[in-house]
Amino acid sequence: MLLVVDVGNTQTHFGTVRDPHSPGGGELFERWRFATERVSSADELGAALRNLLALRGLELSEIDSSIVSSTVPELGPEWAEMARRYLGHETVVVGPGIKTGIAIRTDNPREVGADRLVNAVAAFELYRSAAIVVDFGTAITYDVVSDDGEYLGGIISPGMEISLEALWSRAAKLPVVELGEPRALIGKTTIDAIRSGIVYGFAGQVDGIVGRLRAELGSDAPAIATGGLAHHIVPTYTESINVVDELLTLKGLQLVWQRNC
């Protein structure tokens, strides 16, 4: 069984895959999310993994291979060490030198985030055409793949929760507001007005940027939304997103693993 791990700045999303060598990818058997702790040790990660697997009737011994992508530099080595100690193998860590199967057409390929690359791999594998991936996490990233399966680059903007935090931390009279659905476009309270601004503001950003990217590509490329916060605005408040795929990054990790093992 294959363990696929996506370590984000805010959350870590991971799952197990049975029959990972099957063409096009095996079935994702189980998956979990937990808060990313930047000071986690290999032993803490191993204990957490053992406990979560046990809740689903699984054991560490059933995992015979793994792959990790991490946007938190200090946690990649800890996951690799955890795999050595608790799983008994060397994990694949997505980074420079890893075979992705796509050409990276950016000025500095080494600076492209691992999660963004595996999203691009999954998008092209699924659609075999130009594609746009919108990943809603700590930041909102837009990544573009060409008709030839090349990673062309993308766009990074502050995420919804970062924007909320900036409002209440920089504006003295504004309250702390949790991300949530607005009751109406025109807010009747300060909280409603803030939620409306975040949700409709980011929905407008998504539709505007996706439209411009399609014009740049010269095609009606499919737009795929993913990430832990996507459900707050997609598909209810957006018009440009074709598909919501919460598992896109994990699917991409499995594909990259296949190309390296």
Locations of the language-model features?
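Short beta-strand scaffold segments in enzyme catalytic cores
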Residues: 12-17, 133, 140-145
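Short glycine-rich, Thr/Ser-proximal phosphate-binding strand/loop in the N-terminal lobe
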Residues: 1-51, 149-175, 180-181
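Short, well-ordered amphipathic alpha-helical segments that serve as non-catalytic structural scaffolds
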Residues: 44-56, 205, 209-210
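Conserved phosphate-binding catalytic cores of ATP/NTP-utilizing and phosphoryl-transfer enzymes
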Residues: 100-131, 254-261
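Short glycine-aspartate micro-motif
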Residues: 2-6, 67, 131-135, 224
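Short beta-strand-loop/turn "lid" adjacent to the catalytic site in phosphate-handling enzymes
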Residues: 54-112, 148-154, 159-160, 188-199, ...
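ATP-binding/phosphotransfer module of carbohydrate and carboxylate kinases, centering on a glycine-rich
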Residues: 2-5, 36, 40, 166-261
